[in-house]
Amino acid sequence: MTVDAVRVELGARAYEVRIGPGLIARAGAEIAPLLRRPKVAILTDETVAGLHLDPFRQALAEAGIASSALALPAGEATKGWPQFARAVEWLLEEKVERRDVVVALGGGVIGDLAGFAAAVLRRGVRFVQVPTTLLAQVDSSVGGKTGINTAQGKNLVGAFHQPSLVLADIGVLETLPPRDFRAGYGEVVKYGLLGDADFYEWLEEAGPRLAADAEARQRAVRRSVEMKAEIVARDETEEGDRALLNLGHTFCHALEKATGYSGRLLHGEGVAIGCALAFELSQRLGLCAQEAPSRLRAHLRAMGMKVDLRDIPGDLPSAEALLALMAQDKKVVDGKLRFILARGIGQAFVADDVPGDVVRTLLEDALAQR
């Protein structure tokens, strides 16, 4: 299999997302052209370090690149002030200079945190994303959104800071636990839902074999990245079209906050549930036929994924409390909730005027089924 390259066109800050097998083994040769001195600082997590850090550092060493690494605890709880401060202090102790490169080796948590650290360190150093989860490869590693969570909500502190290169090694996805792979699929299916009905139709057929079929997996990652790159190139800082990428996320972020950013609900699982709720909301508002949310739920069920609020273990707050959590979402404009709704599969759009009582009733009905 060959390596695919998708270019994110952002003028002088354009970069490539390289997708294919064996990219970690070739990481030194891939990263070397970016370096002004043969040294990088790697931020990773303890789980990824045990699987991929040694091969990655060996690949760098073979290209004559020295490296140091800090492994943070794995999990969403790491994406907050304490570990962020620890990472920045460590980068300063490592004497990372403005012309150097920081490497984010891991999933979305590490990519977001390391990218934000790179954005603020010495007012901005370059960084390379080496995403090791399906979710990070198709979504969080591309587009320059970086940040951390706070007590008030998810991703409320951060910066737009584009990577200089993304290396998406699809081979490492074979080491993912099945639940993590399925969670990442929540972001893959989102792309078909928001703007490519043909891709969604292909996923209905190919989705169940992605974990075992490297060629299908690479196609799914490539098409997802192509769609994100196109949208980011048009709207880097989310003033317009880029908001479409938040399909399912208004519900998702509230549910993640309600479950304490814990193992009860992974981000991609929340996205899948959020997409199902967004399509159900669209149907209730008369925007799409009932067939669309029913078809989506059937596909997610066939993939073994969480689909409804009843699939989340443990207690959940009331519909009113979930609405209050949504009001903290960073997509709120002039105090109004923004939802990504759909007129059908592949036909998403941004809506600023969704009646709160319709959302409340939707949530009440979903909670009543638990």
UniProtKB/Swiss-Prot annotation:
Pfam families: DHQ_synthase, DHQS_C. Keywords: Amino-acid biosynthesis, Aromatic amino acid biosynthesis, Cobalt, Cytoplasm, Lyase, Metal-binding, NAD, Nucleotide-binding, Zinc. Pathway: Metabolic intermediate biosynthesis; chorismate biosynthesis; chorismate from D-erythrose 4-phosphate and phosphoenolpyruvate: step 2/7. Gene3D superfamilies: 3.40.50.1970, Dehydroquinate synthase-like - alpha domain. InterPro entries: Dehydroquinate_synthase, DHQ_synth_AroB, DHQ_synth_fam, DHQS/DOIS_N, DHQS_C. Binds 1 divalent metal cation per subunit. Can use either Co(2+) or Zn(2+). This is 3-dehydroquinate synthase. The gene is aroB.
